[in-house]
Amino acid sequence: PRSGARASGAKGGHVLEQDLDASRGFRNVVEKTRFQAERIAREALDGGLPVTILRPSLIVGDSLTGEIDRLEGPYLLVTLMLHAPSDLRIPMPGPGDVKLNLVPIDFVVDAGLHIASLPSSVGETFHLVDPKPLTTRRIFELIAARTGRQPPRGFVPAGWATTLMRTPGLERFANIPRTFLEHLLTDVVYDDRQARRALEGAGITCP
């Protein structure tokens, strides 16, 4: 089954593929449901069902066409940038030095199908992630340059940003879910050594 890197909950720092620890709690219901789903899958494995768990990070559009099937996550912040006045420099939520792990859907599909076809993958968990993610500030600088907009200027302190997004009605106004905002503020590295080993020789890498 497809779980998600968010099954690790509020844990920051280095997250191993076999980690499934709820001791740090969850920042939102998405993380909690990912954790619960993976726990159910692991119980099924203990019961004899052949299970391979795939944990992609934040999934974005096709790496060649950019096509997406829904507007969510980073695309909402891009939309906010595009609809702002062209000379307005929107501040970053947080200092912008957190690395945002994004993976294109075609990589997730190709890698997932290959790994799931390997008999040795049964009982294992694999992070499908970008091994060299960019910082949030660099990502939005590139978006600004590509769209002719002003790059982000300054930042809103992390505590202020999350508090503001808890204000009733403000999340809807900004159209940026708090769950995505929390990604921009959590410094985490997803270890993917098992996934890289499984993909060796297959010609499948995160672009």
Q: What name fits each language-model region?
A:
Residues 80-95, 158-205:
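A hydrophobic C-terminal alpha-helical subdomain
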